[in-house]
Amino acid sequence: MTDKIRTVQGKVVSDKMDKSFVVAIERTVKHPLYGKFIRRTTKLHVHDENNEAKLGDVVEIQECRPVSKTKSHKLVRVVEKAVA
């Protein structure tokens, strides 16, 4: 059985923790009755072994085994650095 490793992109909204940060992932959902597209945000805690990601960066993350109670994703790469 081959499992596809799920990767997503998001924006770093907090990097105050050691070896971890919080990513906000935005998606659009169509309202069931009115049909208007609404933005929904999901926040995930991500493991960052080398503290590479900084506030405002766009990063690519993937699912992994649970690292702690809230962290079950890890950093793959920094896609775009934040403008300083």
From Swiss-Prot:
UniProt cross-references to PROSITE patterns, sorted A to Z: RIBOSOMAL_S17 (PS00056)
Pfam family, one: Ribosomal_S17
Name assigned to this protein: Small ribosomal subunit protein uS17
Similarity annotation: Belongs to the universal ribosomal protein uS17 family.
Function (record text): One of the primary rRNA binding proteins, it binds specifically to the 5'-end of 16S ribosomal RNA.
InterPro entries according to UniProt: NA-bd_OB-fold, Ribosomal_uS17, Ribosomal_uS17_bact/chlr, Ribosomal_uS17_CS
Transmembrane segments: none
Organism encoding this protein: Haemophilus ducreyi (strain 35000HP / ATCC 700724)
Gene expressing this chain: rpsQ
The protein's assembly and partners: Part of the 30S ribosomal subunit.
Keyword RNA-binding in record: yes
GO terms, molecular function: rRNA binding; structural constituent of ribosome
GO cellular component, one term: cytosolic small ribosomal subunit
Gene3D superfamilies hit by this protein: Nucleic acid-binding proteins (2.40.50.140)
Keywords: Ribonucleoprotein, Ribosomal protein, RNA-binding, rRNA-binding
Region forming the signal peptide: none
GO biological process: one example: translation
Keyword Cell wall biogenesis/degradation in record: no
Domain of life: Bacteria
